[in-house]
């Protein structure tokens, strides 16, 4: 038995300079686990509740001392003496202790920090890397990254409505080669933007945030940069979008303020289909708003046979929300963010449910990140085959790529880069 003897939380800073919670778990054999919790900028209405202090005198109300106190008090007292390898029991006890549907009493950030730290401590106690401890002998798929190289929407201060323009190195034969390809395109894009007179400041996730007029202009710069780096758009490197459309869905219309367009669900679906017809776009995240179920079903009927349609705000990593989508025929993929649901067990349940019904899963970071690289291990543990963890700059993003490179080295010849194999794109 790997008995939990201490749980300690502290308030640290994330990549945006906002407070977040970090948790250390210690076991009776001396094993330890540490986890830091991320936070999003564009958040779904159905996400688990992130506990913030609301004290305007500290961090403009964004402090997390209440969550820290919950961990160091109630949660520590409840879990002391438990076997850390009983992950589902640990998570269930915390959910029951909280007693609310969305983890709003203790805070999903408090619960998640403990959940992940317990898993890490148990992995160390078992003398296994986290991906192997969670995924077993079959954990060996290195995910194809979605690399966010142009930022818009809530992730940047520019007029571009679509939140993320990403590249996917689909022809790479390894994660290390995929990272190299992405980095080369990233640097080519920087020069291309600079030569065109645009600034090369970066947004929350490390992508560039130039003052562009439209999605077409953003994609045009990326296509040029792929070619400038020596690659073939669509063959070596495909494109992916995160529309984050809930952010601009107002009164039943999709308000593309940057492009001066006000579109119905059907019109916005056609707008996206037009982009897919002209560019090698394999995946679109949040192509419709979180409550526009009819729009989602129509978009899936329109594009679902040839484009991966990823539900983020739609599903919020929640198996119950995903079950509704499965029944309705909405989307064909789920974005997986551990802090949307608040425990490791529920996260794994969402991935399992998706795979069971032929949906893909994309492991994802948040815009407010830390140096914690847990999601890299989770991507390999679940064999989901795709990861979304930002651009090729900022240490909070690079930490995940570097961890994947280490895992690939550990796996050796049994490791396999996913490439196109795990993408629902016809």
Swiss-Prot record:
GO terms for cellular component: cell surface; extracellular region; phosphopyruvate hydratase complex. GO terms for biological process: glycolytic process. InterPro entries: Enolase, Enolase-like_C_sf, Enolase-like_N, Enolase_C, Enolase_CS, Enolase_N. Keywords: Cytoplasm, Glycolysis, Lyase, Magnesium, Metal-binding, Secreted. Its cofactor is Mg(2+). It catalyses: (2R)-2-phosphoglycerate = phosphoenolpyruvate + H2O. Pfam families: Enolase_C, Enolase_N. One of its GO terms (molecular function) is magnesium ion binding. Pathway: Carbohydrate degradation; glycolysis; pyruvate from D-glyceraldehyde 3-phosphate: step 4/5. The keyword Transmembrane helix does not apply. Its EC number is 4.2.1.11. It is found in: Cytoplasm; Secreted; Cell surface. (2R)-2-phosphoglycerate binds at residues 163, 337, 366-367, 388. The active site is at 205 (proton donor), 337 (proton acceptor). Residues 32-53 are annotated as: Disordered. The keyword Zinc-finger does not apply. Mg(2+) binds at residues 242, 285, 312. Binds a second Mg(2+) ion via substrate during catalysis. Its main location: cytoplasm. Catalyzes the reversible conversion of 2-phosphoglycerate (2-PG) into phosphoenolpyruvate (PEP). It is essential for the degradation of carbohydrates via glycolysis. Belongs to the enolase family. PANTHER family: ENOLASE. NCBIfam families: eno. This is Enolase. It comes from Hyphomonas neptunium (strain ATCC 15444). The gene is eno.
């Amino acid at each position: 038995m790997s008995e939990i003897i201490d749980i300690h939380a502290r308030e640290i800073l994330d990549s945006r300079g906002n407070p977040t919670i970090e948790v250390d778990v210690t076991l009776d054999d001396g094993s330890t686990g540490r986890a830091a919790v991320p936070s999003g900028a564009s958040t779904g209405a159905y996400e688990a509740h992130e506990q913030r202090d609301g004290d305007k005198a500290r961090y403009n109300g964004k402090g997390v001392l209440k969550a820290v106190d919950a961990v160091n008090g109630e949660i520590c007292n409840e879990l002391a003496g438990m076997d850390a390898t009983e992950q589902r029991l640990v998570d269930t006890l915390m959910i029951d202790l909280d007693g609310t549907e969305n983890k709003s009493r203790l805070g999903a950030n408090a619960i998640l920090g403990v959940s992940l730290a317990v898993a890490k401590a148990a992995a160390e106690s078992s003398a296994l890397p986290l991906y192997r401890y969670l995924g077993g002998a079959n954990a060996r798929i290195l995910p194809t990254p979605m690399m966010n190289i142009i930022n818009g929407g809530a992730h940047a201060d520019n007029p571009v409505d679509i939140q993320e323009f990403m590249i996917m190195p689909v022809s790479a034969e390894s994660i290390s080669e995929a990272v190299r390809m992405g980095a080369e395109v990233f640097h080519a894009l920087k020069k291309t933007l600079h030569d065109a007179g645009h600034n090369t400041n970066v947004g929350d996730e490390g992508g560039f945030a130039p003052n562009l007029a439209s999605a077409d202009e953003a994609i045009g710069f990326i296509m040029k940069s792929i070619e400038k780096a020596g690659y073939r758009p669509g063959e070596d490197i495909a494109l992916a979008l995160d529309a984050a459309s809930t952010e601009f869905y107002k009164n039943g219309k999709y308000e593309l303020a940057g492009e001066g367009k006000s579109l119905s669900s059907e019109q916005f679906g056609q707008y996206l289909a037009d982009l897919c017809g002209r560019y090698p776009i394999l995946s679109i995240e949040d192509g419709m708003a979180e409550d526009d179920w009819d729009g989602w079903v129509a978009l899936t009927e329109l594009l679902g046979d040839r484009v991966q349609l990823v539900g983020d705000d739609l599903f919020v990593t929640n198996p119950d929300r995903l079950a509704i989508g499965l029944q309705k025929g909405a989307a064909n993929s789920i974005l997986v963010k551990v802090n949307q649901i608040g425990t490791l067990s529920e996260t794994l349940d969402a991935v399992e449910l998706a795979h069971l019904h032929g949906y893909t899963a994309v492991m994802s970071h948040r815009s407010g990140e830390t140096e914690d690289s847990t999601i890299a291990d989770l991507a390999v543990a679940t064999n989901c085959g795709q990861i979304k963890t930002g651009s090729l700059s900022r240490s909070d993003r690079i930490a995940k790529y570097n961890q994947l490179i280490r895992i690939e080295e550990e796996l050796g010849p049994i490791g396999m880069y996913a490439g196109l194999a795990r993408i629902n794109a016809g």
